[in-house]
Curated annotation (Swiss-Prot):
Taxonomy of the source species: Bacteria, Bacillati, Cyanobacteriota, Cyanophyceae, Synechococcales
A Pfam family reported for this protein in Swiss-Prot or TrEMBL: Formyl_trans_N
Name the UniProt record assigns to this protein: Methionyl-tRNA formyltransferase
InterPro entries the UniProt entry points to: Fmt, Formyl_trans_C, Formyl_transf_N, Formyl_transf_N_sf, Formyl_transferase-like_C_sf, Met-tRNA-FMT_C, Met-tRNA-FMT_N
Enzyme class of the recorded protein, top EC level: transferase
Gene: fmt
Role this protein plays: Attaches a formyl group to the free amino group of methionyl-tRNA(fMet). The formyl group appears to play a dual role in the initiator identity of N-formylmethionyl-tRNA by promoting its recognition by IF2 and preventing the misappropriation of this tRNA by the elongation apparatus.
Amino acid sequence: MNILFWGTPDYAVPTLMALHQAGHTIVGVVTQPDRRRGRGKTLVPSAVKAKAIKMGLRVFTPERIKQDETCQQQLAELQPDLSVVVAFGQILPKNVLNQPPLGCWNGHGSLLPRWRGAGPIQWSILEGDPETGVGVMAMEEGLDTGPVLIERNLPIGLLDNGHTLAERMSVLTAELMVEAMPLIESAGQGSEPERRARLKVMNQSDRSGDASYARMLTKQDHQIDWSASALNIHRKVMALYPNAVTLWNDKRLKLLHCEPLIDRLREELPAEVHPLIGRWPTGGHPPGTVLESVKGLGVVVSTSGCPILVRAAQLEGKGRSDGDSLIQQLNAAAEQQFGTFS
């Protein structure tokens, strides 16, 4: 089939490649414009644009597709059979959604209707969901409200972070989208209700669970509150990897990997941290207090309940440090305090 592909980050690249390798014709790729990054503020293309150029594909970079009528016309002239959208980053207007005869299909990173919107992967970890998944959804004007054609579940491990989980989900999204293509093609053209009936899509209103929305994360969301529980701090560090931040001696410190020293989670934690579980009494120190630097592992810090082990971090102006290198870099003495943002 002739496919118009919409996507921007690394997450979308496997789907673009898989559709091409499956023999479909990618008539065009729509992605976000180049953005300035790094200290030199150099213009950098999106991951999808970089891959599309290597593949010799035609690329479109509208700043706002809703308002760019010229780009809309150019895309219509490509006459795609359908559009495939994976993490594009803009809401498509109704006329764009209605243009392809076989519809617009989105690869979404959650088990809808849970976690509609931006950042479903991060929110599934933040909220402690035991599993997530990916689905192929028929797009409509509402935010991720369309019916689901097919989906797959994926467990979330205690030590999964936003990056590792996204990598697994991006591969699964690509597999699922390739699987969906012959189903969509076999349903043929016709009105949207007719095609959906032939496809036997699942309306979200008929599915279990209430709808929830993965709102955009704020600067404050990334700041560590040491008065939270060890498990909630751990979830924040893992979900927002590599951007959860605290203060150490008035400098910003990114926390890259932590492990909550909680007995009921023992089986999910590495064996080398098991001797640390239960070593310190709960509530014996103010939250954010350094309890001990443990050789080869990292720094143990108090929380509102059980302590947490900080195993990897990045101090402002420095590179990543783990275990002993982290201990050396922080030079943390017992009873020292991590800071909080006012």
